[in-house]
Amino acid sequence: MRLPDVVLVALGGAVGSVARYGLGLAALRASGSGLPVGTWAANALGCIGIGIAVGLAPSDRVRLFAVVGVLGGFTTFSAYGAETLALWTAGRPGWAVANVLGSVVVGVAGVVLGLLLGRAVAA
C-alpha cells in the first residue's frame, strides 16, 4: 500500500459515508413503510455507480477514490443483512423476504443500467 493511494481511499470513504448517512436520514423521514428504503436506495445507487465505473474504466487513482473510497463508504450489504434479520426477528418475515429479493433485483438492475450508461458515455 502506498500512502497516496490510502489517502485517496480514505477521502473517498469519508465522502461516501457522509452521503450514505444523509440518504439514510432522508429516506427514514420520507418513508412510511417498514422497509429499509435507505439501504435499498444506497445499494441501487452504489450498484449504478460501480456499473458506470466499470463502463468508463477510470484511471487507477479515480478508481481508488470513487469506487473503493466513495462507493465503499456509501453502500454495504452488511447493513442489508442486519436490517433483514431485524425485520425477521421483529416478526415480519414477509418484509424480510421482500427486502432480500428486492435488494438483489434492484442491485443487479442497477449494475446493468450503470454499465450501459458508462459505456454510452465512454463511446
Predicted segments with their positions:
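Membrane-interface helix-loop junctions in multi-pass transporters/channels
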Residues: M1-A123
